[in-house]
Amino acid sequence: MGNCIEHQDYLIQPKGFNIPYDAEKIHGISTELAQEQGLPLVEVLEKLNEALNKSKFVVGQNVGFDLNIMGCEFFREEKSTKLLELPILDTCTEHTAELCKLPGGRGGKFKLPTLTELHEYLFGEAFNEAHNATADVEATTRCFLELIRRKQYTKEQLDVQPDYFVNFSKANPKEIQLIGLKHINLQKASAKIHEQLQQTQEIENIESFVDVSELENANFVHLHNHSQFSVLQSTISIKDLVASTAKHNMNAVALTDHANMMGAFHFVKEVKNHNRIIKEQNEEALEKGEVPVGEEIKPIIGCEFFVCEDHLNKSHKDYGYQIVLLAKNKNGYQNLVKMASIAYTDGFYYVPRIDKKVVEQYKDDIIVLSGNLYGEVSSKILNVGEKQAEEALVWWQDQFKDDFYLEIMQHNQEDERRVNQVLKEFANKYDVKLVATNNNYYCEQEDANAHDILLCVKDGEKQGTPIGRGRGYRYGLPNQEYFFKSSEEMKALFKDTPEAIVNIQEVVDKVEAFELARDVLLPEFGIPDEFKDEQDLEDGGKRGENAYLRHITYEGAKKRYGEITKEIEERLDFELATIENTGYPGYFLIVEDFIREARNMDVSVGPGRGSAAGSVVAYCLWITNIDPLKYDLLFERFLNPDRVSMPDIDIDFDDEGRGRVMDYVINKYGANQVAQIITYGTMAAKSSIRDTARVLDLPLFDADRIAKLIPTMSKLGKIFGADEKKLKGMFRAEDLEKVNQLLNIADGEDLEAETVNLARILEGSVRNTGIHACGVIITPSDITNYVPVATAKDSDLYVTQFDNSVVEDAGLLKMDFLGLKTLTLIKDTVKIVKAKHNVDLDPDNFPIDDEKTYELFQRGETVGIFQYESPGMQKHMKDLKPTVFDDLIAMNALYRPGPMEYIPSFIARKHGDEEIEYDLPEMEEYLKETYGITVYQEQVMLLSQK
């Protein structure tokens, strides 16, 4: 009737294994405690059999798990038992799930309750010491007996007489109380043993301490750093990373973002820029007989990969282990690129993943650091067992030999201390070198709170939610030690393991500095045999491409101009010579090819925009449809012989046909050679305020009010970095008043001030990634031979991990394929006119002097006309009342930031309301068409030449 007949507690001695630290944290039983106070397993199994022989049922919470474990142990020890023959009464069933009614079960059902949840449902209170074995048994017993009292079991289940429940209720008229078992505090007992062991280990460490001078003279550099490209996980910008390295006089630094290499090019570029400045300053200092100002920095490109069991298996969530890989040289970098690409294109499942087979395939010229607590060796020490951790270590050592290092960290955490002790033992046993790292996510310790806000933004959490695991908790770093520490701070942390500091320079010395910038590589373009030149095969020349380009250009010129005058010939020869000297004939051939094919597919192609309209070669190839000679457009704006840079042609297609042109390019060059370009969505000033406010639980109204104080397109960094005088020059009076309100808020000590000041740190953080609207990359071979790639949600194409600001410097050919709705409208209109009126219209030959069209512009009726349909432009059209095509061209050029202020003068001069003046009489030749106002870049260039 609910009475305790017998109760026994036993600790079992671990044999051939150790109890992982994470299991010890939950149950309080350490390996040392179990070895000291435990009994052999065989003895405990015999005692369990004695109890089972007296029992009618096996009762428990989720007891199937216990049956499997104990059944295996009986089998392993070759002991017979009644355990699996007895009927089971489980307190964790679909029936108790219906009682507790907790949402979140499979198939829309209620979830099975945990022991704590069931206890809370039955008694209105949680029970203390969950996961203490004695407390668990007592709570399970209480729940089981209460379920009997409430008649939640049938007489058939309990195998009792019909009057049993009446008698049980009489014996227990009130809810069941705890039976009063004595709880052994195993955590305290384990902690006491650990304290004794730690004192012994400290004595041993002091005895083995190496020469202090070796530690003092050792170079320390940070080999484990995350930048803002570890999206929403780090507040460190690339610029900050390099600046912090320089600030602490370190001679190298590594970039090891989570599973991607988005920041690699920016990183090398920033370091190169720093080194250039330092070199100049040091040379200047030496000339003056002064001490050099600083050290040059060696950039170490790395990546912290998620290495799982099978990166192709997407049937279950497997994040794998976090392992740091560093490139020793350019070939190692190329292998990182391959792995980072595979992680996204093949292995992405919740996170980008690779596996050990991928690592084996691309392991050449790679250095491996074993990683943080989520690294394979460390994680297995904590969660699985030291034997399995050793097996993992052996695999990595077999693969990478002396390029494999055990990474130890000191963030003032007990779990790290436990791991480090084992790692040191492994290092001695397997002759693997230790390296000391700090897992850096922010630059300064005071940035820890801002970083925590960033993690909350990532997970959509409030900062007030406690950090921990499970329902009602959120992710967060355990303390504020994850910052870019100085050499002195790191040496102090690792004074008991000085070799971990000394070994770092060995890693740095293994790395060769290399350049990522390169000349643009064009895909091979097939030309007719009669134009091929055998010498090109020997020296990689472009004689054949130049000859073929000249041929098709002059053929096109005959069709465009009929008679090729001396002026046309000179212009063509000048442009072709410039194209030959800059090495870009292939570029024009590639563009001409897909534009011609677009027209063959009945895709509308725009007449041309931007500087490409200044090329007569482009006009003769039908790349553009505007005659540069007619409009005095200069080729030098497009391709300057004195400044060699990649030509840039923006090509408009009707938005419905753009996809077909893309398909043609993919089919021609191969899907593995064509990619779109990634974009990084960053936290702008206003969004950083709103995100921070949400996390801090600042009311939405207040967050919106503060955000509106920031002038459009302004940055918090610039506002707070400017003095009063500079601010007056930056903003108009009404905006300046708002800015001053913002500054006053930041000076306060309330939640609003905290929001603004934290938002300043978060501003500029990468929040998400997207796809460039029109940029397309074409490479000579597999794109992963050049840059890392990823995949995008709405596209089957690869996406470069490098963004638009660096793809060209990285040697990639970039084309802009613009989908223009206006072209689709024109195309549809032509079809409608044909269908309704049987009139054939050719948009390429519409007259540009049609009076009725000008009347539409004069009335401002320009809806649907590309770049003329905004309300502001419509107003100016009404005032201008254009009469010639030059008026429309000029207004298009003027209607943008900067030149806008000249629009009133332009309109007044056209109508004779303002006198047209020229600073010099010679200027009239070039400025007459724009009423004496310099509107176009061509005008500036022509005037400077004159």
Q: How would you label these PLM feature ranges?
A:
Residues 26-45:
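Metal-dependent phosphoesterase signature
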Residues 1-31, 49-172:
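Metal-dependent phosphoesterase core characteristic of DEDDh/y 3'-5' exonuclease domains
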Residues 37-38, 60-62, 371:
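Short His-Asn-centered micro-motif
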Residues 192-946:
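Alpha-helical scaffold/interaction cores of sigma-54-like transcription cofactors
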Residues 146-150, 157, 171-212:
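Extreme N-terminal flexible tails
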Residues 44-47, 51, 244:
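CheY-like receiver
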Residues 4-9, 34, 88-89, 220, ...:
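Conserved beta-strand scaffold positions in the cores of enzyme catalytic domains, especially
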